[in-house]
Amino acid sequence: MAANAAGPASRYDVTLDQSDAELVEEIAWKLATQATGRPDDAEWVEAARNAWHAWPATLRRDLAGFRRDSGPDGAIVLRGLPVDSMGLPPTPRVNGSVQREASLGAAVLLMTACGLGDPGAFLPEKNGALVQDVVPVPGMEEFQGNAGSTLLTFHNENAFHEHRPDFVMLLCLRADPTGRAGLRTACVRRVLPLLSDSTVDALWAPEFRTAPPPSFQLSGPEEAPAPVLLGDRSDPDLRVDLAATEPVTERAAEALRELQAHFDATAVTHRLLPGELAIVDNRVTVHGRTEFTPRYDGTDRWLQRTFVLTDLRRSRAMRPADGYVLGAAPQPA
């Protein structure tokens, strides 16, 4: 395993060789400088989709294989992607910052998203930007979200949402100068064999509620209790946010405690370096972040994030004009 990761070894760790890295950089620069519009525009995404097909065949095969089977860890790291580290401005310090203008990072993220499915975003979250900054923000150190710097608990991205992302992509533009900040991932495929029978039974039962963040302002009745495990009993999907999922029975509470303990025991920590892209299978893998101490001097850790939906059609009722941004509620007929 690469020196900047800790925990159980992943079989999905791809380093681009020099020729592949140079080709991807050439394609990304061309997209960033020649595509019409901005990364949030449909024509820019279409240009990214077309550009994806020019990527090295071996890299496209690697990602196609990951899309079909994300493996026992439910995550892959691509190393050696272009991010223009020397040309980066200071790390943003503003809550809700996003990448609206064309950039090398936006090109890499949206091309990769088109290779896995379609990019997607949620209007109540960072105003629906397809490429979002993940940076520490002064005064939000204890926040359980991407702007914080305290320990971020394990969660599926937007676990409360019917159309939560299938994949979460995090591209490192600038590493944490202290070396402490790390993406943590834990996969249900590692955890399931370790759980007691009683905990497994409880996790399959509709005894959990997961609240949305206040920004979504969802109306209507409170969501009915739902299970944490979904789908096939031998290879289930996972729907949980340890900061927002509440048990409605005592056995559910005990099951969450055991689940969290095994997440911690099996977690892989990825201390991403510039040009490294982590892709998390949000269906089977939770993610979080280690604690770190920001400097707020322009050199702090800077990731950019894009969500991927593998079946964009399913969310059509929530996407005005058949775009890539989901609103807070279905559109009226």
From Swiss-Prot:
Pathway: Antibiotic biosynthesis; calcium-dependent antibiotic biosynthesis
Cofactor(s) needed: Fe(2+)
Residues binding Fe cation: 155, 157, 287
Family annotation (Gene3D superfamilies): Clavaminate synthase-like
Residues the record lists as binding L-asparagine: 125, 146, 157-158, 305
Source superkingdom: Bacteria
GO biological-process terms attached to the record: antibiotic biosynthetic process
Residues where 2-oxoglutarate binds: 301
One Pfam family here: TauD
Knockout mutant characteristics: S.coelicolor strain A3(2) / MT1110 and A3(2) / 2377 lacking asnO produce non-hydroxylated asparagine-containing CDA variants, which are not synthesized by the wild-types but retain calcium-dependent antimicrobial activity.
UniProt-listed InterPro entries: AlphaKG_dependent_hydroxylases, Clavaminate_syn-like, TauD-like_sf, TauD/TfdA-like
Function of the molecule: Catalyzes the 3-hydroxylation of L-asparagine to (2S,3S)-3-hydroxyasparagine. The 3-hydroxylated asparagine produced is incorporated at position 9 during the biosynthesis of the non-ribosomally synthesized calcium-dependent antibiotic (CDA), a 11-residue acidic lipopeptide lactone. Is able to hydroxylate only free L-asparagine, since it hydroxylates neither a CDA analog with unmodified Asn at position 9 nor a peptidyl-carrier-protein (PCP)-bound asparagine. Is not active toward D-asparagine.
Protein name (record): L-asparagine oxygenase
